[in-house]
Amino acid sequence: MSSRFPYNNLTYGPVNETKQDSLTRAITEADEYFKGSVSAVPFMKLIASAETDYGRHNDETALSYGPFQIDPIRYFDITQAPGRMTEKHKKRLSKANEYLRKKLNDPNFNISKLAVYNPETKDYVKDSRNLKYLRNPDVGAVLTRLALKQRPEQIPQGIENMVSGYEKIWAPKWSQSKDAGILDKKRKEAKDKFVKYNTEESVMAENDKVNSAFNF
């Protein structure tokens, strides 16, 4: 379904879409807009599957924001951290604003001003968060694609490589565990959730080769 249709409070997407439909559309369109040499769609779907059961989370109780669970430090690194604002990345942020202003029908949208980060607390300044946009799947998909653009690694292809990439690149809390049993359990959960929610992509992912998707 085209994103030109009216949005339901700009939270999930066109009014006739489910949350999962909106998430799939958001991922596909964001990857198309910030296209690399290979698709990042399967990997982004794995991240969303592992983080929120592919958008089946409760925004009010989730620890971070949106279907990809963008936390304060990650948001700061993507949009505000002075040391990461290369000229190339600044251009990406400008393109992200151009894209999302049209998609959200908000000429004042600024992806770098959705929250104010406090480096001392490693959290957002109280009352600085724009929850409507931080929870929006289109915004989350763009932030996720931008985060991948910042990385030097290749976009992982194939389920096993994607699970390893999720652990290394997205670095969920469990990735810091020293317990091999916990690590194996969480890796299996990430894989199983991706297969459960993205059957077609799980088959395609096994057949894809590893190529770079960071040539912007």
Model-derived segments and spans:
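Catalytic glycan-binding domains that act on GlcNAc-containing polysaccharides
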Residues: F5-D184
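N-terminal secretory targeting signals
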Residues: M1-N8, P14-D21, E201-F216
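Long, amphipathic alpha-helical surface segments
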Residues: V163-F216
